[in-house]
Amino acid sequence: MSSESSAEKGPPPSPAENVQPGVPPAAEEPGMISVDIAGLFYQFSKTFILIFPVYVLGYFGLSFSWLLIALVLLLWWRRNKGNKNSRLYRALAFLENEEKSVKHHIASTDLPAWVHFPDIERAEWLNKTVKHMWPYICQFIEKLFRETIEPAVRGANAHLSTFNFTKIDMGSQPLRINGVKVYTENVDKRQIILDLQISFVGETEIDLEVKRYFCRAGVKSIQLHGTMRVILEPLIGDVPIVGALSIFFLRKPLLEINWTGLTNMLDMPGLNGLSDTIILDIISNYLVLPNRITVPLVSDVQIAQLRFPIPKGVLRIHFLEAQDLMWKDTYMKGLVKGKSDPYGVVRLGNQVFQSKVIKENLNPKWNEVYEALVHEHPGQELEIELFDEDTDKDDFLGSLLIDLVEVEKERVVDEWFSLDEATSGKLHLKLEWLTPNSTTDNLDQVLKSIKADKDQANDGLSSALLILYLDSARSLPNNPLEINHDGMKKAAVEKAKKAGKKIGSSPNPYVLFSVGHAVQESKVKYKTAEPLWEQTFTFFVHNPKRQDLEVEVKDENHQSSMGNLKIPLSQILASEDLTMNQRFHLNNSGPNTSLKMKIALRILHVDKPVRSPDEQHTSQVKRPSIFKGKQPPTPQMPSPSPAVAHKPPPTPKLETNKKPENGNKGTPPSASPKSPTELHQSSSSLSGSSFTYSPSHLPAKEPTPSIASDISLPVATQELRERLRQLQNGTTLGQSPLGQIQLTIRHSSQRNKLMVVVHSCRNLIAFSETGSDPYVRIYLLPDKRRSGRRKTHVYKKTLNPIYDQTFEFSVSLPELQRRTLDIAVKHSGGFLSRDKGLLGKLLLELNTEDAAKGWTQWYDLTEDGTRPAVSS
């Protein structure tokens, strides 16, 4: 058989099969020698490239450390590059087959939002539509780059006159929408609010070059993930029904870029994070709150109001103190525990505040105040992170996420919050929701409350909010010498002359605004005397009766002033609706030069919380802050003692990272209204579940009930019945012979967790002559593993313990109807004690509709928990 036919039919036979008897083996083909030579040359070249830098260092007498530094940078760069590529390929694989990825147990962080949150819809029809439109979207993007961005870059600088895009390819993978959420509560009737969970993972290729300098650069892949809000408003009674479309990101999206060419240096260590941050800042200037893109669909819509609406409110954050923070600094290689140098980072949308650093303190006190604008709610959340300052990398101490809907509802929240993602630690915050009012009725009261003095500077707490919309300018002078010289700085003109700039060229105007010490600057508009800005600016005002708004138009090209203006804020106070919308003539400028602006002043005031009649009783159910020391003695009787009655009512507890709920409207049908006495005794509300006590948060030395006590449940039940017969001894026991337990139960669809708040117990039976040492143990059946067990602290020698502890179970709302809460009140006899027993049980079936709304109620304890009678 010939070699050609054997190659066609299959793999070549082995040498033994190929050699015929009496025929010497064929000589080796000459081609094999050339392959060896090529491999040898490749190996020699590789070795030479590795050794040559060492020779160069020795030849020039340089230090060997330069080679080590270069090697470290190369390895670090390759590692970062590999991580980026792996994330890109993983995301691409997930987008190609989402269902298969889910079945193969992909990491939960990579799953789309609709998997975690039931209120977010998958909307696959939208992805199919985008996929069909993607080629035409790519054509639009390419047209935008070539006809808009490319000419703008060329005109920005003479050195970039040969700039052009050589290739623009957005890739075949379209933008994907992982979930859509439509808001139906707490929104205006004339608007529709949608949140889109967008994800773009594309092999995008954008190449550019500057021919004059033989410079080539580009991008070969982009990843973008974030939550984009789309607002359709106002709804009108005519076609097209929607007046305008507003698009923006609620917070900075996640961005990752792989560079090519000259820009590949941006992937080097130290520059990779910086480059992404700069690009994110550019995106934030256009698409992250308070900035937005507004597309008018009808001509008579007030675009200025839609693009830059007045903020919904101002959040005053009192960043007070923390307790029991984790220790991160160690000595003698961890043998000696040190302390931490904590500081906090507070984020609200695009606004970031950082506290001072408290050295070597696990119970720091900052006592700092920040004021942040709230532009959109629901949707915006207050994010707080605590760090331990170190010389190399700051250590994480815990975080906190607070839904602002609850803060707006309560107006003032002064509370201790347990830190998430931390084994210990709690943070004391006071949050005030300030409502912008268009009247001066409360101005004197507000000025008195913040102790506003005669100081012109904007240093103290704010009494008002100044919102300024800069529209355009008219008839700006082209020649600085045309301006009134009394208002000119001669040095500025001389500087422009020395710089060789043409005096009569078109200006590059921008505007400076200042109120007190706060200064803000508009964008620069190039080569125009009729600029159009359409920008908004917001200032916090300490005392509007005494402060002024100073405006100055400057020319970046000539480094000179083109006119100025001063507006006393008291003039705005005298205007109708505290608003001025007009053209303002500029001083020290041309005769017809003017600025078109809309200026609004809003008085910041803490309004009283407004609750519906159904929510009036829930507002009284409050819970005190965490005590610094031991729990104070609890009363032995359920009726309130005088010491309790005259205590000032504590502020309401606020749940972190939860959706707006409807108070206690979801009380089960069998639940009856609580009496005023019970309301006074209750120490926690439905909205109060930010104290999340997971097993990792509990003290390590807390006594743990025996596992055998759960296994031998029939024995414990029999002993409890025997104890009841002994207590009865011929007498008639009351309606609740084993006592009662008060619980709050609610399912958070946003966090996908069931939250159970154990408030207190009353009238428990005495396990011994000295009383009982009760604690509460909880299972979410059928899960009875040790990891699924939750338990409260133990309180000694009391029959009326007050716990006020919150426990969380990860369970979806549809699955909840198949689960049962197993709650047992037990006596803890101490470590290794045999005096442990059951004080009462409660088995509670969970209804999905009721759990979504939540309720707070007293329940009777029974021997086996099969009769969960609801107390009136």
UniProtKB/Swiss-Prot annotation:
Record remark on domains: Anchored to the endoplasmic reticulum membrane by a transmembrane hairpin structure; both N-terminus and C-terminus are cytoplasmic.
InterPro entries associated with the record: C2_dom, C2_domain_sf, C2C_KIAA1228, Ext_Synaptotagmin_C2A, Ext_Synaptotagmin_C2B, Extended_Synaptotagmin, SMP_LBD, Synaptotagmin_SMP
List of residues binding Ca(2+) 2: D329, D341, D388, E389, D390
Highest taxon of source: Eukaryota
Family indicated by similarity: Belongs to the extended synaptotagmin family.
Protein name as catalogued: Extended synaptotagmin-2-A
Region (Disordered): 1-25, 608-711
Binding-site residues for Ca(2+) 3, renumbered to this chain: D390, D392, D394
Ranges of compositional bias, category Basic and acidic residues: 608-617
Places the protein is found: Cell membrane; Endoplasmic reticulum membrane
Pfam families documented for this protein: C2 (PF00168), SMP_LBD (PF17047)
Lumenal side stretches: 53-55
Its job: Tethers the endoplasmic reticulum to the cell membrane and promotes the formation of appositions between the endoplasmic reticulum and the cell membrane. Binds glycerophospholipids in a barrel-like domain and may play a role in cellular lipid transport. Plays a role in the rapid internalization of fgfr1 that has been activated by fgf1 binding; this occurs most likely via the AP-2 complex. Required for normal fgf signaling and the activation of downstream signaling cascades via its role in the internalization of activated fgfr1.
PROSITE patterns reported in the protein's UniProt record: C2 (PS50004), SMP (PS51847)
Binding residue positions for Ca(2+) 1: K328, D329, D388, D390, D395
Stretches assigned to the C2 domain: 297-417, 442-588, 737-859
GO molecular function, one term: phosphatidylinositol binding
Bias type Pro residues, positions: 632-652
Entry GO CC: cytoplasmic side of plasma membrane; endoplasmic reticulum membrane; endoplasmic reticulum-plasma membrane contact site; organelle membrane contact site
SUPFAM superfamilies: C2 domain (Calcium/lipid-binding domain, CaLB) (SSF49562)
Principal place of residence: membrane
Subunit relationships: Interacts with fgfr1 that has been activated by fgf1 binding. Interacts (via C2 domains) with the AP-2 complex (via an alpha subunit). Identified in a complex with the AP-2 complex and fgfr1.
Region Required for phosphatidylinositol 4,5-bisphosphate-dependent location at the cell membrane: start-end pairs: 784-791
Segments of skewed composition (Low complexity): 682-696
Keyword Transmembrane applies: yes
Keywords carried by this UniProt record: Calcium, Cell membrane, Endocytosis, Endoplasmic reticulum, Lipid transport, Lipid-binding, Membrane, Metal-binding, Repeat, Transmembrane, Transmembrane helix, Transport
